[in-house]
């Protein structure tokens, strides 16, 4: 039987509706949640992401400002802007759109964001809190994956979870979040000896490696939950995930499509984190 679709668009719309209600409640208490997005340079994909974030904020009633800086902006100038935003009482969340130009040290910039405004969840202190299980902002994409599981009624407790990819943005944090929910977690990467054998063990398989259609149906356990974080452009117009959707959907119990799976969840979680920051 073909897999059930984990519809990220539908679930993200539910999350956004919850956020909109929470924003109204906060405004009634005199708190107006605010997000600042910083974009350096002209990267076309980044421009689209930033536009989408700004529009999503408007839809739920979050105040949003976008700071567009030229690609030649110095690191010192960028750090000065972040310092100003850290001190700005109307801004509760700060997001620096990655990637940054090569001459800017990404790590230094992320470190400069005040912990209580780090709604992307990337700062070392935030990541440390995630690892030890303290209160933190969950990084948006991993959090989106967990909410997809939750809304589908899938409890990771006692299940074997395999995460393909070990990036700081998705692979590592989603592994930690699954661990916190009592899954048994394996992280696979480019040096994993037998990726197919590892994937076949998974009750929950999360693919976040950035390789088009790397994971095929024969690598998937019957009835597994497959969450595809990858978004890869093939040719001029086609977008595909890290999972070969057609073959995987014949084996999986649940699967996310690409596009329309994890992507919409990422922005919904950013809105959720911004409201959480305002509430704190």
Curated annotation (Swiss-Prot):
InterPro entries: Aminoacid_DH-like_N_sf, NAD(P)-bd_dom_sf, THF_DH/CycHdrlase, THF_DH/CycHdrlase_cat_dom, THF_DH/CycHdrlase_CS, THF_DH/CycHdrlase_NAD-bd_dom. One of its GO terms (molecular function) is methenyltetrahydrofolate cyclohydrolase activity. Pathway: One-carbon metabolism; tetrahydrofolate interconversion. GO terms for cellular component: cytosol. One of its GO terms (biological process) is purine nucleotide biosynthetic process. It catalyses: (6R)-5,10-methylene-5,6,7,8-tetrahydrofolate + NADP(+) = (6R)-5,10-methenyltetrahydrofolate + NADPH; (6R)-5,10-methenyltetrahydrofolate + H2O = (6R)-10-formyltetrahydrofolate + H(+). The keyword ATP-binding does not apply. Its EC number is 1.5.1.5, 3.5.4.9. Keywords: Amino-acid biosynthesis, Histidine biosynthesis, Hydrolase, Methionine biosynthesis, Multifunctional enzyme, NADP, One-carbon metabolism, Oxidoreductase, Purine biosynthesis. The keyword Hydrolase applies. NADP(+) binds at residues 165-167, 190, 231. Homodimer. Belongs to the tetrahydrofolate dehydrogenase/cyclohydrolase family. Catalyzes the oxidation of 5,10-methylenetetrahydrofolate to 5,10-methenyltetrahydrofolate and then the hydrolysis of 5,10-methenyltetrahydrofolate to 10-formyltetrahydrofolate. This is Bifunctional protein FolD. The lineage of its organism: Bacteria, Bacillati, Bacillota, Clostridia, Moorellales. The gene is folD.
């Amino acid at each position: 039987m073909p897999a059930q679709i984990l519809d990220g668009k539908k679930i993200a719309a539910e999350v956004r509706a919850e956020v909109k209600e929470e924003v109204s409640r906060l405004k009634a208490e005199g708190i107006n949640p605010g997000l600042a997005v910083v974009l350096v340079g002209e990267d076309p994909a980044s421009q689209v992401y930033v536009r989408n974030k700004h529009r999503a904020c408007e839809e739920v009633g979050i105040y949003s400002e976008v700071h567009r800086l030229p690609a030649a902006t110095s690191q010192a100038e960028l750090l000065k802007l972040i310092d100003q935003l850290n001190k700005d009482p109307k801004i509760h969340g700060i997001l620096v759109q990655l990637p940054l130009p090569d001459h800017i040290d990404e790590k230094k910039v992320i470190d400069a964001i005040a912990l209580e405004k780090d709604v992307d969840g990337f700062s070392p202190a935030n990541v440390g809190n995630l690892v030890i299980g303290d209160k933190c902002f969950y990084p948006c994409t991993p959090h989106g994956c967990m909410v997809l599981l939750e809304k589908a009624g899938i409890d990771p407790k006692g299940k074997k979870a395999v995460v393909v990819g070990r990036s700081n943005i998705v692979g590592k944090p989603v592994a930690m979040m699954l661990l916190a929910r009592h899954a048994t977690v394996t992280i696979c990467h480019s040096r994993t000896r037998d990726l197919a054998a590892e994937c076949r063990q998974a009750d929950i398989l999360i693919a976040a490696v950035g390789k088009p259609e790397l994971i095929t149906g024969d690598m998937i356990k019957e009835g597994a939950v497959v969450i595809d974080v990858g978004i890869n452009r093939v040719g001029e117009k086609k977008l595909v995930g890290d999972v070969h959707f057609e073959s995987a959907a014949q084996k999986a119990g649940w699967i996310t499509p690409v596009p329309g799976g994890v992507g919409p969840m990422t922005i919904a979680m950013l809105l959720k984190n911004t409201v959480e920051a305002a509430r704190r």
